[in-house]
Design a protein with these regions (language model features):
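N-terminal intrinsically disordered, cationic/polar leader segments
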Residues: 1-55, 62-63, 105-140
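Feature captures hydrophobic
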Residues: 74-77, 84-86, 109-113, 133
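Hydrophobic residues embedded in beta-strands of well-ordered beta-sheets
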Residues: 65-67
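Solvent-exposed interaction patches of small proteins and small membrane subunits
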Residues: 46-52, 73, 95-97
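Glycine-rich phosphate/pyrophosphate-binding loops
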Residues: 91-108
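Alpha-helical support elements that line or immediately flank enzyme active sites
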Residues: 82-93
């Protein structure tokens, strides 16, 4: 399994392949198209992320001490952002998720190319992932 550092380097290199942001947005749309999606039962108030302009749901499962995220959105670019975060953080331990600074978002320039409301939504998605991880750590103690 790849480390977070290896995943980050790979992701940054992947984004650098695309020279302009229209291509990068298309890459995000393509990533979002690869998401499995969630069942209607999983799309509920507990999994809905507050602070997003569009509807975003995030679910966290745990297997053998590692967290695996699944999610969905009703907006295509946001769905790609969800996929980006899921690809980055799935398979990490709760401690890794809590400690990670999500610096790759700045390194690829994503935050600066989103509207303020979408940027707030991105922060909310990161906070939800960290909240799941904190909950997991607390349940272990």
């Amino acid at each position: 399994m790849k480390t977070l550092e290896e995943k980050e380097i790979e992701l940054i290199e992947e984004f650098e392949v695309y020279e302009d942001w229209m291509d990068r947005y298309q890459y995000l749309v393509d990533l979002g198209g690869e998401l499995e999606g969630l069942s209607e039962e999983e799309k509920n108030d507990d999994t809905l992320i507050r602070g997003c302009q569009s509807q975003v749901w995030l679910v966290c499962d745990e297997q053998e001490g590692r967290l695996y995220f699944r999610g969905e959105s009703d907006a295509i670019i946001v769905k790609g952002i969800v996929a980006l975060l899921i690809n980055m953080m799935s398979g990490c331990t709760a401690e890794e998720v809590v400690k990670y600074d999500f610096g790759f978002l700045d390194k690829i320039g994503l935050k600066e190319h989103l509207s303020p409301t979408r940027s707030n939504g991105l922060v909310s998605m990161v906070e939800k992932m960290k909240a799941y991880a904190i909950l997991k750590l607390r349940s272990e103690n």
